[in-house]
Amino acid sequence: MVFEGHLVGTGLKVGVVVGRFNEFITSKLLGGALDGLKRHGVEENDIDVAWVPGAFEIPLIAKKMANSGKYDAVITLGTVIRGATTHYDYVCNEVAKGVASLSLQTDIPVIFGVLTTETIEQAIERAGTKAGNKGYESAVAAIEMAHLSKHWA
């Protein structure tokens, strides 16, 4: 038997956690995510958005959302751009590990929509220009995973 999540978001409740750092990019990711959710049938009043200071703070609030019992899926959005120090490596690794572990801890799909790029140009491309919008893609993944997860609930 083959299982696939369908892409109709009607009736789903979705939490979104967005890092404010690099807000000119993360706001575009959020716009893409909201567009993706609404285009697939998620009602605006079934979407909650929490802004956090930066990417490093995303896992805690995503965990609290997932544990609240209110959401069928949680989307995480942020942007980390490499600088001149090793700070980038620490932030990227910890955020990725933190978000990745949440689905397993909470049994709620937690989608990783955090950009980790070498340059600001790469981030801009992934926030709605040449490379699509990773926020939109994260929204579609959240809908699909929410339905797949419910199959075994």
From Swiss-Prot:
Its EC number is 2.5.1.78. It is an enzyme of class 2 (transferase). It comes from Bacillus anthracis. GO terms for molecular function: 6,7-dimethyl-8-ribityllumazine synthase activity. GO terms for biological process: riboflavin biosynthetic process. Belongs to the DMRL synthase family. Pathway: Cofactor biosynthesis; riboflavin biosynthesis; riboflavin from 2-hydroxy-3-oxobutyl phosphate and 5-amino-6-(D-ribitylamino)uracil: step 1/2. The gene is ribH. This is 6,7-dimethyl-8-ribityllumazine synthase. 5-amino-6-(D-ribitylamino)uracil binds at F21, A55, F56, E57, T79, V80, I81, F112. Activity is competitively inhibited by the bisubstrate-type compounds TS23, JC33 and JC72, with Ki values in the low nanomolar range. SUPFAM superfamilies: Lumazine synthase (SSF52121). Transmembrane segments: none annotated. Keywords: Riboflavin biosynthesis, Transferase. It catalyses: (2S)-2-hydroxy-3-oxobutyl phosphate + 5-amino-6-(D-ribitylamino)uracil = 6,7-dimethyl-8-(1-D-ribityl)lumazine + phosphate + 2 H2O + H(+). (2S)-2-hydroxy-3-oxobutyl phosphate binds at A84, T85, R126. InterPro entries: LS, LS/RS, LS/RS_sf. The active site is at H87 (proton donor). Disulfide bonds: none annotated. Forms an icosahedral capsid composed of 60 subunits, arranged as a dodecamer of pentamers.
